[in-house]
């Protein structure tokens, strides 16, 4: 083997290697689909791989393969050029020295350009995949109100926000690193084994002469080191999975304190919160110490192997060098070949800690995806007919276990009717309202009718998304430039905030509970729904403001059907029908 042959064969080598890489990659992916790991992996990635996205990612994957092949090829050429450089120094041949120095300079320029292009294409691939993957995860989470139904699941996946954002992003990055590492390692192993084979001679070990013994000795050394590393680091898989869960739980608890700051302050609950947070943090620290102790053993072993590997090739080739069988350049190329081979064969050993994290993220994403599949397969019985009115025929609701909570309800509401649902706490008022609106997570009985379009459900604490006050009030689909917005704010006693309409802030936290409920009535007046469901939407308001808001919507929207849940007797004057769930009677006022 010589540098001229290797340089001239580079293009042919890249094309041939690309063919085999694509073939082996395809066969490996098909084989992995039959394993537990492969089934989990495919379950995670397949939903985001539509035809258009798949074509783009495959093309970018081919570019990445070419980048990997170029990296390996540059390493091979680099070893031959340095062989020539060091051999020319031993021969005291200055012309040959400068020739190889210039070749190395050109190779350095090519490697710099390659490194820039490689980084760019890898980032493009990861970003494009992440865009598709994230869109799929978010869509599946929001579709069919699964984000809402998950609240009622017994085995709720922990920290869903972390799984969608962090785990998904790091899963993609780690997948690319693993694929790159495996391909690079296999090709490097093949190429530098050939180089090392050509440089090796007879190795005398314990009185035995072994032809090409350097290669066999190095392989035995690296395989032993890899197996030992896997054995030492195996417990890290479970520990890293636990670490992700504990960190997510701790972040969630901190967010809960922030979101419920006012209630905690009124209760003087700081000592209790601090005790709970310290308990969670102690679990994180305990887990971290467990990881540290395992990593001490793994890192100590890896460090020892790495240091032994630095001297090993020189010691193995020293007899041949001092006997004049090989040159100084051959010694240097042997060291390079050994180091590259060592890195390639030790890929899994050196990557083991990251791989344990990868498996943990894979399992967390798989748990999320399978839960989404489970919810998709659930056949929740919600008999519903589209109509211009609201009607219940022998209607009832069941709880999570299938027990009947309410039954045999018959209601008929035409345009302009208003129904007040009252009853003792726990009788199912809000659940009934959700069932009529079509968002009840469990099974219902009988038939419900209401308009398919033009319904608005307003909970006790209206939701305010991030952004300006204008965007928050107009959530989800009111025109932010609505001509009646400012006047409606005045009509609903919220005119003092008109000047802040274009101010970005956390309006959910800034507005008081009563002000948030006024926002709900602004949305009613701007949306003009056919049916509105009010779940104790005036509970934080004084009776005067409550009277003002109900009168306003009744006057402005006389044909609108209203269904209200509330405890106050003052609400009765705004409703012509009443349902008391404690006796299940429909009364005419």
Swiss-Prot record:
InterPro entries the UniProt entry points to: AAA+_ATPase, ABC1_TM_dom, ABC1_TM_sf, ABC_transporter-like_ATP-bd, ABC_transporter-like_CS, ABC_transporter_sub-D, P-loop_NTPase
Superkingdom of source: Bacteria
Keyword Zinc among record annotations: no
Sequence similarity: Belongs to the ABC transporter superfamily.
Domain ABC transmembrane type-1 residue range list: 57-357
Lineage: Bacteria, Pseudomonadati, Pseudomonadota, Gammaproteobacteria, Pasteurellales
Coiled coil: none
Name listed for the protein in its UniProt record: Uncharacterized ABC transporter ATP-binding protein HI_1467
UniProtKB keywords: ATP-binding, Cell inner membrane, Cell membrane, Membrane, Nucleotide-binding, Transmembrane, Transmembrane helix, Transport
């Amino acid at each position: 083997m010589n540098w001229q042959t290797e340089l001239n064969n580079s293009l042919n080598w890249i094309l041939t290697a690309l063919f085999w890489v694509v073939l082996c990659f395809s066969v490996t992916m098909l084989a992995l689909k039959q394993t537990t790991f492969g089934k989990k992996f495919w379950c995670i990635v397949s939903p985001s791989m539509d035809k258009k996205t798949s074509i783009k990612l495959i093309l970018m994957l081919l570019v990445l393969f070419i980048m990997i092949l170029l990296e390996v090829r540059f390493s091979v050429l680099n070893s031959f050029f340095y062989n020539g450089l060091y051999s020319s120094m031993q021969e005291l041949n200055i012309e040959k020295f400068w020739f190889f120095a210039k070749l190395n300079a050109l190779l350095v320029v090519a490697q710099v350009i390659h490194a820039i292009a490689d980084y760019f294409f890898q980032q493009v691939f990861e970003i494009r995949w992440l865009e598709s993957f994230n869109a799929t995860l978010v869509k599946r989470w929001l579709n069919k109100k699964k984000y809402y139904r998950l609240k009622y699941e017994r085995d709720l996946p922990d920290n869903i926000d972390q799984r969608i954002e962090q785990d998904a992003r790091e899963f993609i990055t780690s997948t690319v690193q693993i694929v790159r590492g495996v391909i690079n390692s296999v090709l490097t192993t093949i190429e530098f084994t050939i180089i090392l084979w050509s440089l090796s001679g007879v190795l005398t070990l314990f009185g035995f002469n072994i032809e090409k013994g350097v290669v066999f000795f190095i392989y035995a050394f690296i395989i032993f080191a890899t197996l030992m590393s896997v054995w030492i680091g195996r417990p890290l898989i479970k520990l890293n999975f636990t670490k992700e869960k504990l960190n997510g739980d701790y972040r969630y608890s901190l967010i809960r304190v922030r979101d419920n700051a006012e209630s905690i302050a009124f209760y003087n609950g700081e000592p209790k919160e601090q005790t709970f947070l310290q308990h969670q943090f102690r679990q994180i620290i305990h887990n971290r110490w467990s990881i540290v102790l395992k990593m001490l053993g793994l890192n100590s072993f890896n460090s020892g192997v790495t240091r032994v590997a630095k001297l090993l090739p020189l010691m193995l080739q020293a007899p041949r060098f001092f006997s004049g069988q090989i040159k100084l350049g051959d010694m240097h190329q042997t060291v390079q070949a050994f180091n590259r081979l060592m890195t390639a064969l030790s890929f899994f050993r050196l990557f083991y800690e990251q791989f344990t994290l990868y498996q943990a993220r894979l399992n967390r994403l798989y748990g999320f995806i399978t839960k989404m599949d489970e919810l998709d397969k659930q056949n929740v019985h919600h008999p519903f007919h589209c109509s211009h009115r609201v009607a219940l025929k022998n209607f009832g609701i069941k709880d999570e276990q299938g027990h009947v909570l309410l039954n045999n309800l018959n209601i008929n509401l035409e345009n302009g009717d208003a129904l007040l649902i009252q009853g003792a706490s726990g009788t199912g008022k809000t659940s009934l309202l959700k069932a009529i609106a079509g968002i009840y997570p469990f099974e219902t009985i009988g038939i419900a009718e209401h308009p398919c379009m033009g319904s608005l459900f307003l909970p006790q604490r209206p939701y305010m998304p991030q952004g300006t006050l204008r965007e928050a009030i107009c959530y989800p689909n009111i025109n932010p430039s609505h001509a009646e917005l400012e006047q409606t704010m005045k009509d609903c006693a919220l005119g003092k905030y008109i000047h802040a309409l274009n101010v970005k802030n956390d309006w959910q936290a800034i507005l008081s509970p009563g002000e948030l409920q006024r926002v709900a009535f602004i949305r009613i007046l701007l949306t003009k729904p056919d049916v509105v469901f009010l779940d104790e939407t005036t509970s934080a308001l004084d009776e005067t403001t409550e009277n003002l808001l109900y009168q306003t919507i009744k006057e402005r929207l006389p044909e609108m059907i209203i269904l209200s849940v509330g405890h106050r007797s003052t609400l009765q004057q705004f409703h012509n029908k009443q349902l008391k769930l404690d006796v299940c009677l429909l009364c005419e006022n």
